[in-house]
Amino acid sequence: MQQQKIRIRLKAFDYRLIDQSAAEIVDTAKRTGAIVRGPVPLPTRIQRFDILRSPHVNKTSRDQLEIRTHQRLMDIVDPTDKTVDALMKLDLPAGVDVEIKLQ
């Protein structure tokens, strides 16, 4: 018989928020008796943009900006009903995107 698994993927621009959210999820799952694998840090996605400083001339003078998207992945193996209820009631910060898949 195959075990049920919940895969949680977190995305955020601030690594402190994502680590705090991952710790809350792990604590909640362990309190209800589930086995947690992770959080596994996935590669940070870096988007870089070059913007002209001057609207008229000086093409060589540019600003460089970047957006870093941090990601964490964790699996909750063989969750109970209490685990699912506790995760649904969990209040996470606004800057964290949570993607949950049942496998």
UniProtKB/Swiss-Prot annotation:
Gene Ontology biological process: translation
Quaternary structure, from the entry: Part of the 30S ribosomal subunit.
Keyword Ribonucleoprotein among UniProt keywords: yes
HAMAP family: Ribosomal_uS10
PROSITE patterns: RIBOSOMAL_S10 (PS00361)
Family assignment from sequence similarity: Belongs to the universal ribosomal protein uS10 family.
GO MF term (any one): tRNA binding
GO CC, any one term: ribonucleoprotein complex
Source organism: Burkholderia multivorans (strain ATCC 17616 / 249)
Source taxon at top rank: Bacteria
Keyword field contains Ribosomal protein: yes
Role according to the record: Involved in the binding of tRNA to the ribosomes.
Entry keyword set: Ribonucleoprotein, Ribosomal protein
UniProt protein name: Small ribosomal subunit protein uS10
Signal peptide, first to last residue: none
NCBIfam families assigned: PRK00596.1, rpsJ_bact
